[in-house]
Amino acid sequence: MSVSCELREWRGAGSGSAADAEGYAWEGDAVVWRGGFEQIHVNVARFSTDDFNPFHDPGKWRRIAGNPFAGPLVLGFQCEALIENLIAHLPNHPEDEAFAAEQGLAWTHYEFTFVSPLLPGERFAARARAGRRQQAPTPSIAYRILVRTVDRPVLTGFVRRTAESLNALTLADSAFARPLSEAPDRLSRGGWFLKRKFASTGHAKNFLASALANPADWFDELEGRVNFPDLFPPALLSCALLEQAQASGHDFFKAPLVYAAHRIGVQGPAVRALRSNEPIHLLVRTPEPVADKGGWPVARLSSLALVYAGREDRLLAQAEVQLAPLAAWPPPGSD
């Protein structure tokens, strides 16, 4: 969240609104991006994160049993990365960063609900409201966000920055122990699965570009700037979940699952300290039914996850990923 975006403003005659050269418009206390993803953006997103979900494949989506969608889908993490970049374009972003540094707000919590799918070529608007800072009872900054097409919401939620994590999940809750680098890749143990990836500025740049962000805001070799975005390491969890499911014999075509919600806590300074070729250890728990259906006709599934980095196992992120069977689509209240 500490990325520096220098906005290049223009003012339309009599419009009273400001926008930068990349299409981000300031409207009141909000920043809005209007446009659309194309299949090339989806391909870059899935290739940069090794996401092989057939829902995003321009050919395999047709083989999914009972698929009601008219084409491949934009990745959930792709939309979320757009939101992260959107917040960095808020006009009061420098003041938020100063407050966060003063109050030691090291954690950023992304809580998103997936309301409806977004397809390549669909026009949409992504909006983030100015952050609300508060000192009591504990210091924090909160942002409300919304992604919607002209006729339906796509993603809703909020982003909150705090000094401490809001998630109690630790390595001790998993079936693994330090040092994680000694465990082999793709190891299943006690209902948990370890997937190892490696940090790559090239992959992170491509991921940002797939999310309609300018990678130069985050990385510049000539200026010595290396800032991995918060959501790049968690975006690799999709690959870990897919490989875990594949190892257990799950059939992605006959029993398709869709994202219902993401709850992701990111320790920003630890992510910003990432460097190329550092190992990233992704731990995901086998999805389990959620007791509260939340109005869904069938139980959702919840997978807990942890993301660590380096040989010293620095904690980058904690997450809960909720999924739902495609047969339960659409979710309640999506009309």
Predicted regions mapped to residue ranges:
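Hot-dog-fold acyl-thioester-processing enzymes
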Residues: S2-L105, L166-R263, A324-D335
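A cross-kingdom feature marking solvent-exposed beta-strand/loop segments within repeated
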Residues: Q103-S116, I264
